[in-house]
Amino acid sequence: MASGKEIRTQIGSIKNTQKITSAMEMVAASKMRRAQDRMELGKPYASRMRAVVGHLANGNPEYKHLYLQEREVKRVGYIIVSSDRGLCGGLNVNVFKQVIVHSKAWADKGVGVDLCMIGAKGTSFFNSVGGNIVASVRDIGEKPKVSDLIGSVKVMLDAFAEQKIDKLYLVGNEFVNTMTQLPSVEQLLPLQPDEDKKLQHQWDYIYEPEARELLDGLLVRYIESQVYQAVVENGACEQAARMIAMKNATDNAGDLIDGLQLVYNKARQAAITQELSEIVSGAAAV
């Protein structure tokens, strides 16, 4: 059994770690609320952009933009959103597993896979497993900007336009609530028909310049907005997952301290009992 001094040292060390994890939990909770606000602020823009693109596409059915055309799939691309830092539980691992399963289904059909990475953790992981990374961006911070993402997104859009890839997917985390974040895979290109019944009416807007020119520009902006929204939402997921991970670490540290305190008390009791026994034995000998 360890000595009382060793146990006290262990308890002190764990208490110091517990203070750190508790502080990190509070910081993550504060950052999560701000990230949620950014996520909610971005949703109306992305939703409205989708509606406008839908109106334009429905109002001009004879015009099939390249981003709307289905073709034989020979190669697919993935834009993968991960965090730059760790200590957020299985958040990134769940996304990576989803990518591996999804891409394997294509690979089994003889389809090649290209990857665009957003976040240091994803870049590190797929470099280690031999993924074909064609673009990457990292260190975008807690307040990402669309301008930070445009370069990497453009690489994938150009690849689709040049028919180097035939489908483009966006993979990230969906924020359900503080306790639940789910990995999601969404097809970005070619764009899927909008099932919203609100878009099935017959009226249309009058656009300047003409709708076709506007659609060309809006489709690119729409893809960029979807990627940006995924990055912002992943940021909220990251802070929520980190808060839960640090709470669990703090609770586990408390359990360890309780267990070590019990061991220390038993060791101290045994030492006192032994001393009393020696005193009694010495008195009896006299």
UniProtKB/Swiss-Prot annotation:
Q: Which GO terms describe its cellular component?
A: plasma membrane; proton-transporting ATP synthase complex
**What PROSITE patterns does its record include?**
ATPASE_GAMMA
> Which family would the database say this protein is a member of?
Belongs to the ATPase gamma chain family.
**Alphabetical list of InterPro entries matching this protein:** ATP_synth_F1_ATPase_gsu, ATP_synth_F1_gsu, ATP_synth_F1_gsu_CS
Full protein name? ATP synthase gamma chain
Summary of subunit composition and partner proteins = F-type ATPases have 2 components, CF(1) - the catalytic core - and CF(0) - the membrane proton channel. CF(1) has five subunits: alpha(3), beta(3), gamma(1), delta(1), epsilon(1). CF(0) has three main subunits: a, b and c.
Which gene codes for it? atpG
Where does the UniProt entry say this protein principally localizes? membrane
* Entry keyword Cell membrane: yes
Q: What does the record give as the function of this protein?
A: Produces ATP from ADP in the presence of a proton gradient across the membrane. The gamma chain is believed to be important in regulating ATPase activity and the flow of protons through the CF(0) complex.
Asked whether the keyword Transport is assigned, the reply is: yes
- Any GO BP: proton motive force-driven plasma membrane ATP synthesis
- Mind telling me which SUPFAM superfamilies this protein's record contains? ATP synthase (F1-ATPase), gamma subunit
Which HAMAP family does the annotation name?
A: ATP_synth_gamma_bact (MF_00815)
Under the GO molecular function aspect, what terms does this record hold?
Answer: ATP binding; proton-transporting ATP synthase activity, rotational mechanism
